[in-house]
């Protein structure tokens, strides 16, 4: 552990650097209230550098935090910053709009959070495996194409454009949809998924010579409904990072397109709020970045996740507070949505 003065110096260097983006010297620290001479402060900064908590850029006499320094700060010195009422009001107004579908809320939450912070935001909605199927229909687009739609009891909607095989006429298609609805409406998606691989094909084959493509379509759409969707807001904000200095950092943009990697990134959900820095993110493309992840719970509807990804030099005290309040506001918005859905059920 550090001495009280070393704690104060490290705290002030990180606080100033995350806000100004410039190396911090002894003069600035004296102006910030560090009660010591310039020589003493420089000696303490040198000690912190030897501990691996600070780095001295070649072109400056000041110091900047290292990833290890940020980790120490987060673990021992970080104090959440109180948000202004106007900032909370903006959140509430942004999340208080009318939403018609659950995924719309989750997607918009990522965009709203990104706009509020100027960082990249990631959002995952509550678990959908306990949702029930309330409708499957096909709407004609032209002679050979339809849009297939699956709806659940909690407002999840999946749709996909489908070309009708020549061996299937429109009348047979309507009958197939009717049978699927008769047998599966009201069932949990997990049961629907299981029955789709067992008795439903047998039932359809009793009535039709071919079910070419229809069952595959329904199966694919259910897989989409089951998949934990991660919505990304402000992806281009990754390019605004001061840490981006070579082509490897630009590859982090492609990382945002890989849902499997994003799921792995957000797989740790054992704490309400957590901060991971650099190598803790488990991906070389994010080695100079930090992730602040907040989990929330919707009673009877499972858990969701909202997160911020950005430079390791982000202002943690402000971002931590903002994310904490945002997750509560998002949970309230989702709870209101579910209650409105339940009231119609």
From Swiss-Prot:
- What GO molecular function annotations does the UniProt record carry, in alphabetical order? DNA binding
**One GO BP annotation of this record:** negative regulation of DNA-templated transcription
Record flagged with keyword Transcription? yes
Alphabetically ordered keywords of this record: Repressor, Stress response, Transcription, Transcription regulation
Q: Which Gene3D superfamilies match?
A: 3.30.450.40, Heat-inducible transcription repressor hrca homolog, domain 3 (3.30.390.60), Winged helix-like DNA-binding domain superfamily/Winged helix DNA-binding domain (1.10.10.10)
Domain of life, per UniProt, equals Bacteria
Note whether Mitochondrion occurs among the keywords.
no
- What family, per the record? Belongs to the HrcA family.
Q: What does this protein do?
A: Negative regulator of class I heat shock genes (grpE-dnaK-dnaJ and groELS operons). Prevents heat-shock induction of these operons.
What is the protein name stated in its UniProt record? Heat-inducible transcription repressor HrcA
